[in-house]
Regions:
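Short hydrophobic targeting helices and cationic amphipathic motifs
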Residues: 8, 12-15, 28
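Cyclic-nucleotide recognition modules
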Residues: 118-181, 185
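Phosphate-/nucleic-acid-contacting segments
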Residues: 23, 29-34, 208-275
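Short phosphate-coordinating micro-motif centered on Lys-Gly-acidic
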Residues: 86-92
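Polybasic "coupling" helices that flank or enter modular domains
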Residues: 163-236
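Cyclic nucleotide-binding regulatory module and flanking cytosolic helices
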Residues: 34-83, 127-128, 132-133
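Glycine- and acidic-residue-biased ligand/ion/polar-headgroup-sensing regions
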Residues: 84, 95-108, 124-125
């Protein structure tokens, strides 16, 4: 499931976005990715996780101290990923799920003509890498759109522990269900919406996801290019630019380079769901 996160089924995604995965990493770096590793001992990681501002998003509610300690025992290190670097590649063996602590990623696949087809955008507090569960290999590339930091946990250990900790098992099921909902949302978006509806849905979804993490829901800094947005939405660059210009002319948004100020949220909602 490389396609993640369009306005859907929109409220469901927003609610589910508050659940995520945690601050764990015992994965060894892939040399070909040139990803910088932040070596940390067990006690240091425990402190880092306890103080992490993603803890409420990542950890299942209701775990006992003993259960938390068992999760802590799987921790090894965190990873820093520089802008433009790849976290995992299409075809690479699947071993981990990744929680994004900071930064922004895109997932993409190479189309037949050699261009990258963007299949999703992921931000801090969200999970990346679930595409590999199906056949034990990743089906897309994950590329950092800005300097980022991630935590990883071996999926085999997640499965083992979730069989013993009911709250963790429920959390796993909830995350997988969310990805199915998101996949359906993208299919709906690309199959039936006009250009204006697609871009409006994209902006609303991005605003909702940021707001659920304590950021402004009207002031957006787009980490992706317009070309990448167009690739994700199935629209040409010229169409994206024209649609943004139309939104500006109608007083719906103000745009300055990658900064987007949503002036009229209701107007965007009316575009997606006309009365």
């Amino acid at each position: 499931m490389c396609r993640l996160g369009l306005f859907s089924i929109l409220i469901l995604i927003n609610q589910a976005g508050k659940a995520g995965w945690g601050q764990f990493d015992i994965y060894q770096p892939l040399a070909k990715n040139n990803v910088k590793i932040d070596p940390m001992n067990h006690e240091t990681i425990k402190i880092a996780c306890a103080n992490c501002n993603m803890r409420e998003l990542c950890m299942p509610i209701g775990l006992s101290q003993d259960e938390l300690n068992r999760i802590d025992e799987m921790i090894g290190s965190r990873r820093k990923v520089k802008r433009g670097e790849t976290l995992f590649h299409n075809g690479e063996k699947f071993t981990n799920l990744y929680a994004i602590r900071t930064g922004f990623f895109k997932t993409c696949i190479a189309s037949e003509d050699g261009r990258d087809q963007v299949t999703g955008f992921q931000m801090a507090g969200e999970i990346i890498g679930m595409d590999g569960i199906v056949n034990d290999h990743h089906t897309c590339d994950a590329v950092a759109l800005e300097d980022a930091e991630i935590c990883a946990m071996p999926f085999a250990e997640i499965e083992t522990l979730s069989r013993e900790v009911n709250a963790l098992q429920h959390h796993v099921h909830k995350i997988m269900s969310r990805e199915i909902v998101r996949e359906h949302g993208v299919m709906l978006l690309l199959g039936s919406m006009r250009a204006e509806e697609r871009l409006a849905a994209f902006l609303l979804n991005l605003a909702q996801r940021l707001h659920s993490r304590g950021f402004s829901q009207s002031e957006l800094i787009l980490r992706m290019t317009r070309e990448e947005i167009g690739s994700y939405l199935g629209l040409k660059l010229e169409t994206i630019s024209r649609t943004f210009s139309r939104f500006v002319e109608d007083g719906i948004v103000a745009v300055k380079q990658r900064h987007v100020h949503i002036l009229n949220t209701q107007a965007l909602q009316d575009i997606v769901n006309p009365k």
